[in-house]
Every structure is written in structure tokens, then in C-alpha cells.
Amino acid sequence: MSDTIIQIKDVNKWFGDFQVLKDINLNVEKNKKIVVCGPSGSGKSTLIRCINRLEEHQQGSIIVDGNELTEDTKNIEQIRAEVGMVFQQFNLFPHLSILDNCTLAPVWVKKMPKKDAEDLAMKHLEKVQIADQAHKFPGQLSGGQQQRCAIARALCME
């Protein structure tokens, strides 16, 4: 049995005439975390968006946990629940508290009970040393604090 959870083979993606992803190959092993880094405009976000099917790739194959990503999106919620992302812009909802930002996806995507999601969020907020800010809103925090909240939010999707 393979320990590969994400397999990307010869993936290509264009926006019009501009090829943003060219022959991308990548294997991610189960329980490993990776960082996709590179200069602005190099396709990092596009690659991640293809992995969770927010964007469609035009050539190649992407397999997540044994499910090949095709036009058939019946398993997409399960796949999205397994792919966590943290972006340079934190995209926290300004009208929600930090705690609510962290619990939103586990409750709506994973159907986790609210109390369990709150306990999980507090665990991860403690991990990034910002649990004392849980009831504040993003606009009340510094950029670094917002970044740590975004990391905790991604961790909440386990």
C-alpha cells in the first residue's frame, strides 16, 4: 500500500495563452506537510487551487487520497476537507471573531459539532500562542497575529 496521499503527474494549466503550470510532478506522503514557495506569479496558489479543485487543470492528473480529480466532483467536499491552505493574505472574515473564523469550516464542511469545533480551535489557537485573542475580530489584531489565526484555522481542518 502506498503512503502517497497526493500525486500530481504532468499537470498543465493555462489562463488564455499564458501557461501558469507546466509539467508539474509532485508526490506528497501521508501525514507530511509541505510548503509551496516561489516568486510572485509562479503558480503556487494556482497549483494549490487545482489540488482542491477551486481551479481546473487542463492536462495531467491529480489524485488526492485515491480520488482522481476530474470533471466529476462528487467527492470534492471530502477532498477539500483534507487539503489545508494558508495564503499570504489571511482572508479572515472581518465580521467573525477569531474563534468563529476557526470553527466555520469544521462545522460546515466536516459537519463537526460546534462545541467540538470550538475545543479544537482553542487547542490550535493555543498552539500558535494566540488563544487569548479568540473573541476579538481580525481588525483588532496585528498582521502577525492574523497570520497565526490563519494557521490555526488551517490546522482546524486536520
Segments (PLM) and residue ranges:
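ABC family nucleotide-binding domain
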Residues: 3-158
